[in-house]
Amino acid sequence: MSNPKLQTTTTDNAGVPSRDEILARAKDIAAIAAKDAARRERQRELPFDIFALIKEAKIGTLRVPEAKGGPGGSISDYIEVLMILGEADSNIPHALRSHFNFTENLALSPIELEDRRHLEHVLAGKLFAGASTEQGTKRPGEITTRLSADGERYRLNGRKWYATGTAFADFGTFSAIGDDGQPIGVLIPLDRAGITILDDWDSMGQRMTASGGVLLENVEVLPHELTTRKLGSQIGRHSSAMRQLHLAASAAGAVQGALKDGVDYVLRQARTTLHSSAETANQDPFVQKMLGEISAGAFAVKTLIREAARTLDRTAVAFATGDEEAIEAALLEGSLATARTQIIASQLSLTVATNLYELGGGSATSSDRNFDRHWRNIRTVYNHNPLAHKARVIGDYYLNGTTTHLREGRVF
């Protein structure tokens, strides 16, 4: 790992890929991942090799501004990379969610001393992940993990869940309760003694995101590794909307993957329908119609995601102006845009994944093809956030001007 004592940063971009190079490298990595995606998912084989390539390609530097030594990619660029990777395997972009949430804060915040250390790690290709959620608590968001003083240092003890991407990462952030009873965060190297990353994620979909548990047993924490998290801050609210769009983009990748699988299946094996006069499946009007509908759905989903990304780009631009009124207006529009996108994109995405089976008969259900992974992955992604609540919040806003949940900086 990079030197933890490193205290300086540089705006010299040497060794950091450009925005265009990252997009090209993402396509190369996706091509490699796609070759074995169905088998990997069927056997639940975590893609450590793919994440090694992602680190080598420095995909995780994309949102770091040029002034801070990065390629200066936009949110639209980053979302595009997610959909490129997701078309090959939607698990891959999903597992990068915590990392890009972390780098968004680096991109938009003033760089303090400790941030300089983290920035150097990001620019070196290191990945960040972690977990806040715990199982077995009375309400979501409750924390039982404890950070206790131990002389001039601290000890961290607890068990986390939904540690998405942590198995592939180099550094992790974890929430805890301090000796004073107040919430506190830590950001520590994941190879530190006492950290055990568990391979116990048992979801029906997104099975290779490494979203299971992490045991924290008497883990040493240094004073400079303490962090604070402000969900209600402006950057925190922006990041919340971006995290939700990240999930939608991962699912959009699965939709594009379903379209690709459908085309390949028709051209290579599918037969005509029983009542068709066509001799081959690619000439069958029933198959053509269904594939056209699948293509339209996939196009609509990608278009929705891209438009929401452009909305969040405008929020990032507003931050650069320092205009409080402009920032607040952009944050509100970003929350609305990502919520609207998820409501409709979820419906279209699941329809596409279901209609994939209409392209063939019983052979389309072959477990070897593993077409059902697309539906399972999409359904799992959209189970992360309460879609019905989003629709209600939007309706309340239009009818009554209520913005409470739109401004709280949480997944609403």
Which role does the model predict for each range below?
Residues 203-299:
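Glycine-rich beta->alpha junctions and the first turn(s) of the following alpha-helix
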Residues 27, 253-256, 260, 292-299, ...:
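Generic structural signal for well-ordered, non-transmembrane alpha-helical segments
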Residues 1-24, 412:
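Basic/polar N-terminal segments that are highly enriched at the extreme N-terminus
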Residues 48-56, 61-164:
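Glycine-rich flavin
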Residues 161-166, 243-247, 381-384:
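Glycine-rich phosphate/pyrophosphate-binding beta-alpha loops
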